[in-house]
């Protein structure tokens, strides 16, 4: 009897439940992918720090705290309270811009190991997934009226020939910013996904 009631309940939802199910599935995939990238970013940054002398770590961290990531030019919530107040569409849009801003710089993170070579393709997959989520919520044309405006300049002169100290600083900056941005995207997508469950507690 319970099984029959359950089947009738599912059937009564009809087609209207399908978009929610699809949305949850897409969000789950996107969150899983950005979690993988965030963990990878943390590992790469930790490995790089471990290769430095204590004084080098201290100096580089001091410089980085006074510097900015390229993605800081992308307007995003300033704290967890603003993040929670932001709409799903806004969080998706910001996440898309953050991921897109790494398409070119991520090439310098590739090479040397299998995990590093996963970065660019994983970013591309994540970008596609977020775009699908945006289109499921609203016409993508309204979110990205001018895609050229989303392109940020490469990270300083990272791609030029640099001295040892400057090269260390650029590598530190690149890895630290990548870790920071993947954490942002993970947070935004997790909150947006939570909004699909009205009874869920989305407190950060």
UniProtKB/Swiss-Prot annotation:
Zn(2+) binds at residues 36, 186. InterPro entries: 4_helix_cytokine-like_core, Somatotropin, Somatotropin/Prolactin, Somatotropin_CS. Residues 1-17 form the signal peptide. It is found in: Secreted. One of its GO terms (cellular component) is extracellular space. GO terms for molecular function: growth hormone activity; growth hormone receptor binding; metal ion binding. The modification Pyrrolidone carboxylic acid is found at residue 18. Belongs to the somatotropin/prolactin family. Growth hormone plays an important role in growth control and is involved in the regulation of several anabolic processes. Implicated as an osmoregulatory substance important for seawater adaptation. This is Somatotropin.
